[in-house]
C-alpha cells in the first residue's frame, strides 16, 4: 500500500484510519514541521517520527498508548514524598535544555533531530509545547516534554540521568495536570517505562474520541506559566 506524500504548501492530512497496519500507524510522508502543520497533526491524533536525514513521516498507530490514571507504586510514593525526595520540579523553566538532552541521551536513536528541536522550541515560544524539569540542587537530571491539546497532553520524550528522575517527573506532572483540569496523557506507543506507571493501549477510535473531548475543554489561565512544581 502507498501513503500520501504531503505538499509543503497545503496543510492537509489523510484521516487516521487510512494509516497502514504494517508498519503500524504510518499515515503520510513529506510536508514540513511548521507550527501550523504540527498543531493540526496533534489535533487529529497524528505525530511526526523519522530519522534525521530521512523524509518526514507522520504516524497514528492503532492501538494507542494513553495514561488514563497514573499508577504510583509504594516505593515511588515513598521516593517522591515531600521532605524525602532529593529532587525539585519545575514547569516550562528549561524547555530547550530538556529537549536537547532528550536528543543526546537516546543512544542509537536519531529521531529527535536538529529540525525537530528547532520546530518544538518554536512551538514552546508559541505556548503550545511544554517541559517538566527535574533538578538535583541546580543540576538538570531528568525531564519530559510534549504538546498541549486542550485537556490532553501529548507526551513526546523524557530523559533521566539520576534514579527515578523521569518517573518522578511524569508522576508529579500528572498530579498537577489533573488538578488543573487535564484529563489524559497521550503516550503514543506503549513501552515498559510508561506501562509501569499505568499507561495502557486503547483502540485508535477510542483515543480519537478522547482527543475530541479534550479539545472541548479550556484549562485555566496560567496553567502553563513557568513555575515550581515542588
Curated annotation (Swiss-Prot):
One of its GO terms (molecular function) is leucyl-tRNA--protein transferase activity. It holds the Pfam family Leu_Phe_trans. It catalyses: N-terminal L-lysyl-[protein] + L-leucyl-tRNA(Leu) = N-terminal L-leucyl-L-lysyl-[protein] + tRNA(Leu) + H(+); N-terminal L-arginyl-[protein] + L-leucyl-tRNA(Leu) = N-terminal L-leucyl-L-arginyl-[protein] + tRNA(Leu) + H(+); L-phenylalanyl-tRNA(Phe) + an N-terminal L-alpha-aminoacyl-[protein] = an N-terminal L-phenylalanyl-L-alpha-aminoacyl-[protein] + tRNA(Phe). Functions in the N-end rule pathway of protein degradation where it conjugates Leu, Phe and, less efficiently, Met from aminoacyl-tRNAs to the N-termini of proteins containing an N-terminal arginine or lysine. This is Leucyl/phenylalanyl-tRNA--protein transferase. GO terms for cellular component: cytoplasm. It is found in: Cytoplasm. Keywords: Acyltransferase, Cytoplasm, Transferase. Belongs to the L/F-transferase family. SUPFAM superfamilies: Acyl-CoA N-acyltransferases (Nat). PANTHER family: LEUCYL/PHENYLALANYL-TRNA--PROTEIN TRANSFERASE, LEUCYL_PHENYLALANYL-TRNA--PROTEIN TRANSFERASE. Its EC number is 2.3.2.6. The keyword Ribonucleoprotein does not apply. It comes from the Bacteria. The keyword Membrane does not apply. Its main location: cytoplasm. GO terms for biological process: protein catabolic process.
Amino acid at each position: 500500500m502507498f501513503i500520501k506524500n504531503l505538499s509543503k504548501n497545503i496543510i492537509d492530512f489523510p484521516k487516521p484510519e487510512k494509516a497502514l497496519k504494517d508498519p503500524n500507524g504510518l499515515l503520510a510522508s513529506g510536508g514540513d514541521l511548521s507550527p501550523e502543520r504540527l498543531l493540526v497533526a496533534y489535533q487529529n491524533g497524528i505525530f511526526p517520527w523519522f530519522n534525521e536525514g530521512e523524509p518526514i513521516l507522520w504516524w497514528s498507530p492503532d492501538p494507542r498508548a494513553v495514561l488514563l490514571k497514573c499508577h504510583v507504586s509504594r516505593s515511588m510514593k515513598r521516593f517522591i514524598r515531600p521532605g524525602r525526595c532529593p529532587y525539585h520540579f519545575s514547569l516550562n523553566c528549561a524547555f530547550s535544555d530538556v529537549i536537547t538532552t532528550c536528543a543526546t541521551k537516546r543512544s542509537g536513536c536519531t529521531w529527535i533531530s536538529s529540525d525537530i528541536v528547532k520546530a518544538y522550541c518554536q512551538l514552546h515560544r508559541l505556548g503550545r509545547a511544554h517541559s517538566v524539569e527535574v533538578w538535583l540542587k541546580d543540576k538538570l537530571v531528568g525531564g519530559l516534554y510534549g504538546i498541549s491539546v486542550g485537556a490532553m497532553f501529548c507526551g513526546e520524550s523524557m530523559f533521566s540521568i539520576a534514579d527515578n528522575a523521569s518517573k518522578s517527573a511524569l508522576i508529579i506532572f500528572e498530579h498537577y495536570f489533573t488538578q488543573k483540569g487535564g484529563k489524559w496523557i497521550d503516550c503514543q506507543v506503549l513501552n515498559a517505562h510508561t506501562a509501569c506507571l499505568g499507561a495502557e493501549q486503547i483502540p485508535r477510535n477510542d483515543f480519537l474520541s478522547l482527543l475530541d473531548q479534550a479539545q472541548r475543554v479550556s484549562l485555566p489561565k496560567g496553567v502553563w506559566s513557568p513555575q515550581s512544581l515542588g
